[in-house]
Each structure stands twice: as structure tokens, then as C-alpha cells.
Amino acid sequence: MAITRSSLAICLILSLVTITTADYYSPSSPPVYKSPEHKPTLPSPVYTPPVYKPTLSPPVYTKPTIPPPVYTPPVYKHTPSPPVYTKPTIPPPVYTPPVYKPTLSPPVYTKPTIPPPVYTPPVYKPTPVYTKPTIPPPVYTPPVYKPTPSPPVYKKSPSYSSPPPPYVPKPTYTPTTKPYVPEILKAVDGIILCKNGYETYPILGAKIQIVCSDPASYGKSNTEVVIYSNPTDSKGYFHLSLTSIKDLAYCRVKLYLSPVETCKNPTNVNKGLTGVPLALYGYRFYPDKNLELFSVGPFYYTGPKAAPATPKY
């Protein structure tokens, strides 16, 4: 079949599209020139004119001829005449006189003939005669006394000597030994300082006293026990053991002595004058020494001049 012009034009357009859409990239090696190969030329296409098909005439639309409707008048059915209601003819009632039954004659009551009663006189029975029975008089028979039996004679049972009880030694009581509970030791420690003006330093050789009062009963004076501590060391530290006092509920710690002539006036800082109640004061327990240690103070002495107020610790 010969190639037409239209098909050739389409082939050229497709080739141009493929050329434009092709991916170009730079070759890694320089191109090698090859001599073009001459392909045999195709013969020129022979143009064949298109064959035109005959154009059909447009269809002619004609309205269908519809015959006009023929009017047929409706056929009216014959309406029946309304029914005529006639009353039924009831013949008049014919009166038939009642037939009377013959009347019965009333019954005739006749009294029955009762014979008259025949009187028979009653037969009287004689009244019985009651006679009292004769009861013989009782015959007294004296009682027969049975002989009283003699009291039984009891024989003494033979005495049997029981064997002596076996010897049972008395148990020896050994008192149970209570486990040893070490006594809890109690002690008081603290520091005594001197505050002279703005200078504060520990006092060597100062002492404190512990006053324990026993509350007396009514009308009796209470007794007091006073214990003095050893003199303080160079750091003003004191330590006093309370082994002789069992109850610390009524014990107070107070200042007692200062050997420094320029610092002998006790102050009430931390209750150095009124006394520290040990019952209301906490303690530290040392289990290795079995010791309850009450740490009080620090207490202060001052010189003749009034010292500035010292805060409580």
C-alpha cells in the first residue's frame, strides 16, 4: 500500500517528538567518528486521492397522520324504577270463644267416727316397807405387839498396819539467775564562757551545781540534794556523772562558781541562774557506753560592765 502524505507527516511529527524527549548526557569517553552508511532510498510515495463516500441526504421527518377521534356517545343503561313497597295484607284475627271445662262439684267433708274412750282405772302398787339393817356392834380386838429386835452387835474390824511410805528426798531449790542488765549511766556536760564586753572566752576552773528537790508531803519541808561538778578545763568544758541520783524529774542545773575576778557575775542565758530542768531536756544515748548524756548550756559569766544581749541557742 502506498504511503500517503498524511501518514508521512505523522511519522515526521513522531520522530521530532522522540528527538525532543530523548535524554542527553555527556559521554564518559570521546565519541568515535563513524562514516555514515548510505541506506537505499525508498521510492517516492504515489499519491492516491481519497475516495469520497456519497453524502446521504438528511432524513425528512414527517409527522404521522393521526385520524381525528370519533366521539361515541356513552350508552346509558336503563335505570330501574324504584321498588314499590306494599304492606302485607294481614287477615283480621278470628275470635274463637274459649271452651269451658265442666266445673267439678266441691268435695264433701265427712267427720270420721271416733269411738269414745274407755276409762280403765289405774292399778295401785303397794308402797314398799323399808327396814333398817341390823349392824352388829364392833368387837374390840387388842393389838398384838411385836417384840422389838435387839440392836446389832458390831465387831471391830482387825487393824492392819500400813507399810511405811517410801523415802522421798526434799527438792533443793536453786533460784534462777536473772540475766545481767547493765545499769544505764547518766551524766551532764556543757561549756561555761565569759562574756566581757565584746570579748568571749572559756573559763578555766568554773563549776556548776545540780540541785535535786524531793517534793514533800503536806506540812513538811522538802529536802534538797546538791551535787557540784569538777572544775572546767581550759576549753570551759565540764562533765558530771549522776550515778547517785535515780530520779532526775526534780533536778536543775545552775551556775555555781567562777574563779576569774573580772568575770564573776552569772547571767540567766540558757537558764544559768534559774536552772535547767533535766526532766524537760533531751538527752543523747550512747549504746557503746550505755550512757544517757544531757548537754546543757552554754552558760555565761560577765564582768562588772553590762554585756550586750546574747542570743539563746
From Swiss-Prot:
Signal peptide: 1-22
The UniProt record lists the keyword ATP-binding: no
Entry keyword set: Cell wall, Repeat, Secreted, Signal
Statement: the UniProt record of this protein carries the keyword DNA-binding: no
Induction entry: By 1-aminocyclo-propane-1-carboxylic acid (ACC) and a-naphthaleneacetic acid (alpha-NAA), ethylene and auxin precursors. Repressed by the ethylene inhibitor 1-a-(2-aminoethoxyvinyl)glycine (AVG). Lower levels in calcium-depleted conditions.
Subcellular localization, as worded in the UniProt entry: Secreted, Cell wall
GO CC annotations on file: extracellular region; plasmodesma
Coiled coil: none
Function: May contribute to cell wall structure in root hairs.
Any one Gene Ontology BP term: cellular response to auxin stimulus
Family designation: Belongs to the plant proline-rich protein superfamily. ENOD12 family.
Name of the protein in question: Proline-rich protein 3
Annotated source species: Arabidopsis thaliana
Pfam families xrefs: Pollen_Ole_e_1
Start and stop residues of the Sequence repeats: 30-34, 35-39, 40-43, 44-48, 49-53, 54-57, 58-62, 64-67, 68-72, 73-77, 82-86, 87-91, 92-96, 97-101, 102-105, 106-110, 111-115, 116-120, 121-125, 126-131, 132-136, 137-141, 142-146, 147-150, 151-155, 157-163, 164-168, 169-174, 175-181, 182-186, 187-229, 258-262, 266-270, 298-302, 308-312
Positions of the UniProt region annotated as 35 X 5 AA approximate repeats: 27-312
Highest taxon listed in the record's lineage: Eukaryota
Tissue expression pattern: Exclusively expressed in roots, particularly in root hairs-containing regions, and especially in root hairs.
